[in-house]
Amino acid sequence: MRQPTPLPRELRLLDTPYLHLLDRVTIDPVFVMGLHRSGTTVLSLCMLATACFNTTTMYNMLYRRCLLHLHLHPQEGAARRKELADYFESRNLVTRTYDGIGVGPDAPEEYGEALGNKGRQPLLNARNLPGFMELARKIQYVDGQERLLLLKNPWNARHFLYLAEAFPTARFVFIHRSPLEIIDSQIRMFASLLQERNEYELLLVDWYGELFEQPWKVKLGQWIYGENSPYLYWKIVRHVTRTCEYMRVHRQALGARAMDITYQDLCAQPLETMRRVTTFLDLQPAREPDYAQFIAPRTRPLLPHVARNRTKIERATARYVEEFGLSSRKP
């Protein structure tokens, strides 16, 4: 089965006649903030289970240019949704493969892939903010303005001050995890994306599909970004340590607009931790979900080069670990 596309190129302006419907649509965003592999997806799934939020999904990300049209023409919208579901089934796509998180047309997806940064880090900025605001309003119009809009893009973890300025009413839920575990998990994740073609990522990332059309580039990428690559290791360590320090230094600038939880607490005490989150957001879910169903922490040895450099990593992130009350991983 062919890969589904949002719409033929010449039809991507189908929403234009309906944009006036967004004039009075407001958004009240809640940003989940944290590094990749810090637990942002698990936290988002727990929050979405309360039925108090809308969010970006695979469906509304792929069809973002015609979302209003498909909503106002339900038969066509249902056909597009079925096309996407059939694609998942034909590829036997049940999870994202690298972390076991389930996928499907209505599964939550990070908004970063809608920002059009063409291979660069998908950061929300002044250039792409208007287009993103339009997408956010479309989602609220289609899915219901009585819910808050939950947004997640770990690439923005080192740029949340801009988000706070761009969205003056936004609130932030930070999730923190041991930097050592984050680094180890990120290396495994990014290396796996080049080890074999990931059909799920093909739907979202144009350059990823183009890369696998050129086998020599794949081989080169596997060498540079392999699980045992010193380059990938140092690149990730640099990114993680810088982001941890940014969060440590600037988190308090958000004041009462933000709260913090740890991945360790979410795994050990999911109900109590999520009650803190819903209380902070002034939410009263009609029922309390079984949050534990989304949590499946894995224990595995650190990669050899991460283990060898453990002391250096812990020294570089010690103030962050202390600031947010994180526990050190046992050797």
Map each language-model feature to its residues.
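PAPS-dependent sulfotransferases, especially Golgi type II membrane carbohydrate sulfotransferases
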Residues: 1-24, 30, 187, 191-331
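ATP-binding Walker
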Residues: 37-38
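A conserved segment at the C-terminal end of the G1
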Residues: 41-54
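Short hydrophobic/aromatic-enriched beta-strand-loop microsegments
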Residues: 54-56, 170-178, 195, 285-286
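PAPS-dependent sulfation machinery
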Residues: 59-150, 211-212, 221
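Short catalytic-loop micro-motif centered on adjacent basic/acidic residues
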Residues: 148-152, 260-262
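Conserved phosphate-donor/acceptor-positioning beta-strand/loop module used by diverse small-molecule
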Residues: 152-154, 163-188, 277
